[in-house]
Swiss-Prot record:
Keyword set, alphabetical order: Ribonucleoprotein, Ribosomal protein, RNA-binding, rRNA-binding
GO CC terms in record: cytoplasm; small ribosomal subunit
Protein's organism: Pelotomaculum thermopropionicum (strain DSM 13744 / JCM 10971 / SI)
Similarity section: Belongs to the universal ribosomal protein uS19 family.
Domain of life (superkingdom): Bacteria
HAMAP family (alphabetical): Ribosomal_uS19 (MF_00531)
InterPro entries noted in UniProt: Ribosomal_uS19, Ribosomal_uS19_bac-type, Ribosomal_uS19_CS, Ribosomal_uS19_SF
Protein's recorded name: Small ribosomal subunit protein uS19
Function according to Swiss-Prot or TrEMBL: Protein S19 forms a complex with S13 that binds strongly to the 16S ribosomal RNA.
MF-aspect GO terms: rRNA binding; structural constituent of ribosome
Amino acid sequence: MSRSLKKGPYCDARLLAKIEKMNETGEKRVIKTWSRASTIFPQMVGHTIAVHDGRKHVPVYITEDMVGHKLGEFAPTRIFRGHGAHTERSTALK
């Protein structure tokens, strides 16, 4: 279910304040955040935000196509390493 239109999109206030401050000064540096639920706003385009995936911070460069999506969509939390391989031992058990 989507968020109510009367509430508007959510973005962490501290994250947005840091972005606004960097836009005013023209500074470009990586911003660490744990706020995966924050919506990407147009002011964030061109910045790199390090989004926490539960273990480390994944650097995400924000482009225009990402506006309207959530930060967490670009930092996967699970890593698929593949299904078990068919070995000599596993086939002998059958």
